[in-house]
C-alpha cells in the first residue's frame, strides 16, 4: 500500500500523521512545544526544538503505522503561519528564537508605518492589515536587534523563512530554501496579485531581497528529505499554512465554500476563487492553497478566544474539571438565561479589531448559575463566528460574490454537538462536520498527493470528503436576529467600558 505523511507544525505542538490514499488517518504522533515568554507580550519558540520535535513525531508516526519509509509516496507540510525565523545559510544555525505569530513586540514599528500612510499600499498589494501579527515587522525587528544581523544579511549570509521554509531547509540538508504562496502571503512582503516578493514593500520594511525564499504553488515538488532522517529520501510535495491547508482538506475548492476551525481561537476562511476582494468589513484577503500558477484567494477572519474560553472556565473559574465536561454543564439549563459572555481576554479580533477591549459577562441576575455562564461561554464561540460570517456576507453582497450556503467545521471544539447546533441556528445555514476532522494535516497530505500523481485532480479529492453529521438550523430567522442583536449590544458595552 501507499501512504502520505503530513507534518503539522503548530503553535502548541508538533504532530505528524500518516494517511492512507483514501485520506484516512492511520497513525499519529504529537509532542508539545515549549512556549518562551521573554517579556510581556513577547512569544518565542526554539527553532531547534521545532525541528527536533517535528522529526521525532514523523519517525514515531511511521513506526506506529507499522510501515517502512519506502511505503510513503510523499510528504506534506502545514504550519503555524507568520512565525518568523532567521538563520545562517552556511551552518543552518538560527540567529535568534523564532518570533511567534502571537508576539506583539513590533507594534511601535507598525504604528510608524501607519503614520507614514502605508496602510493603503499594504492592503492593496497583500490583502492584509499593518499589524504585528504578520511576519514582515518581526523580520525587521530581528535585523535591527540581533547584533550583526544587518551586516550578515548584506553579505548574503542569512536566510529568512516562516516555519515551513525552516523545516524544508532542515529536511533537505540546506539544499532548498523555499516556501509556498500561502505562507508568503502572510509576510506583508508579498504581492498576492503577481505571486512574487514586492520591491516596494521590501523597501518599506528595509528587508534585503537576498534573505527571501523562492515561492512556489502549494502543490509542488520542493525537494527530497535527506535519506538518513526518515529512512528514505522522500519527496516534499505540498506546503500550506495551517488555515489554508484546513480549507483545502475540507475540499473547499470553489467560491463560496467556507470552513471554520474551532481551536484555541477560531479561523473562518471562505474560498474566493481567482477574485481578489479587499474587505470593507474588518476581514483580510489571503492566498488560498494553489495547485497551479493561477493565484487563488480566500477571505479570512480570526477570533482570538474560541475554545480558550472553555480553558478559562476550567482553569480560571474552576467551574469544570475538564474541557469535555462543559457540554453537560451547559446542557443543565435550557438556555443562557439572558447571560451574554464576551471573552475579550486579549481584545477582540475580526470583524471588530478592538485590541483594548476586555472580557465581560453581562445579563447576570440572582437566578444565574454556573450552567448559564458555561452555556453563555460556549455560545460566545458561535456568536463571534457568526459575526465573521455576517461580515463575509456583506463583502460578498457588495461585489456580487457567492454567499455561504453551508459551513464546514473542524478543530477540537467541533465535536461539541451543542455548540455546532447553536452555530447552525445563528447562521441560518447547515453546519457540516466531516468524518475526518484532522483537516489541516489532511490538506497537506492532499497537496503532496496531487503533485506526485497519487490523485488525478480536485474532483477525486472532493469525492473523498464525506460528512459525519449535518446540523440544520432550528430557530426562526427572527429569533436568530434577536440573539445576534443581544450579542452586538454586549460587544458595544464591552468596548465602551
UniProtKB/Swiss-Prot annotation:
ADP binds at residues 11, 15, 264, 307, 412, 416. Keywords: ATP-binding, Glycerol metabolism, Kinase, Nucleotide-binding, Transferase. Signal peptide: none annotated. It comes from the Bacteria. It catalyses: glycerol + ATP = sn-glycerol 3-phosphate + ADP + H(+). ATP binds at residues 11-13, 264, 307, 311, 412. Pathway: Polyol metabolism; glycerol degradation via glycerol kinase pathway; sn-glycerol 3-phosphate from glycerol: step 1/1. It is an enzyme of class 2 (transferase). GO terms for biological process: glycerol catabolic process; glycerol metabolic process; glycerol-3-phosphate metabolic process. Pfam families: FGGY_C, FGGY_N. Inhibited by fructose 1,6-bisphosphate (FBP). Its EC number is 2.7.1.30. Sn-glycerol 3-phosphate binds at residues 11, 81-82, 133, 242. Glycerol binds at residues 81-82, 133, 242-243. GO terms for molecular function: ATP binding; glycerol kinase activity. GO terms for cellular component: cytosol. Belongs to the FGGY kinase family. Key enzyme in the regulation of glycerol uptake and metabolism. Catalyzes the phosphorylation of glycerol to yield sn-glycerol 3-phosphate. This is Glycerol kinase. It comes from Leptothrix cholodnii (strain ATCC 51168 / LMG 8142 / SP-6) (Leptothrix discophora (strain SP-6)). The gene is glpK.
